[in-house]
Amino acid sequence: MKIDYLTLFPEMFDGVLNHSIMKRAQENNKLQINTVNFRDYAINKHNQVDDYPYGGGQGMVLKPEPVFNAMEDLDVTEQTRVILMCPQGEPFSHQKAVELSKADHIVFICGHYEGYDERIRTHLVTDEISMGDYVLTGGELPAMTMTDAIVRLIPGVLGNEQSHQDDSFSDGLLEFPQYTRPREFKGLTVPDVLLSGNHANIDAWRHEQKLIRTYNKRPDLIEKYPLTNADKQILERYKIGLKKG
């Protein structure tokens, strides 16, 4: 996969994208990363990338020319996903990360200031994505967050493919509780089932914990999850236990 970032602050990406999984993905030729400062594509001697909005209003708007010019220098095809980071976009999710992990080429347009000239949105962009109902100073942090979520899903990046399959949201539920040594710490012990060596019982316990954890922390996900009769019985027993205290 190749990822290009159009940004006014390319140095922001240096630390995040050159460590841990991102670094290994690049070293193993699973990922190619390129940052482009679209200020270099401004059309006047002052390298101006923003201007006042037509019709009046507060703030500055990113001009179309630098972004369009920068895009012309990229190897963009009809299959390239061009992503605009903006509050009005589709909320980012694990499902969206899975979809984007199958792309060969992604371009993130990371804006600043009040917003973008609408012609950028309507003529260059394939996806508008939001990280939530709040506003950030620029698109760089959301782009880096999305990159991490996407790249770890590329086959061969994590090494152990089971790793991301056990993650929260991978099957619509939150992840089960995890434990490691020591077996007992400050009077707190690891559940016996995890030490039993019985993998069927361990899998059943983990699924039960995922259901209960999701029910407690993200009831909206439980409403969407295709509960089996066995799942419903697990949750019903849990609810009865809560009432009994």
Curated annotation (Swiss-Prot):
It comes from the Bacteria. GO terms for molecular function: tRNA (guanine(37)-N1)-methyltransferase activity. GO terms for cellular component: cytosol. InterPro entries: Alpha/beta_knot_MTases, tRNA_m1G_MeTrfase_C_sf, tRNA_m1G_MeTrfase_TrmD, tRNA_m1G_MTases_N, tRNA_MeTrfase_TRMD/TRM10. S-adenosyl-L-methionine binds at residues 111, 131-136. The keyword Cytoplasm applies. SUPFAM superfamilies: alpha/beta knot (SSF75217). Its main location: cytoplasm. It catalyses: guanosine(37) in tRNA + S-adenosyl-L-methionine = N(1)-methylguanosine(37) in tRNA + S-adenosyl-L-homocysteine + H(+). It is found in: Cytoplasm. Keywords: Cytoplasm, Methyltransferase, S-adenosyl-L-methionine, Transferase, tRNA processing. Specifically methylates guanosine-37 in various tRNAs. This is tRNA (guanine-N(1)-)-methyltransferase. It comes from Staphylococcus aureus (strain NCTC 8325 / PS 47). The lineage of its organism: Bacteria, Bacillati, Bacillota, Bacilli, Bacillales. The gene is trmD.
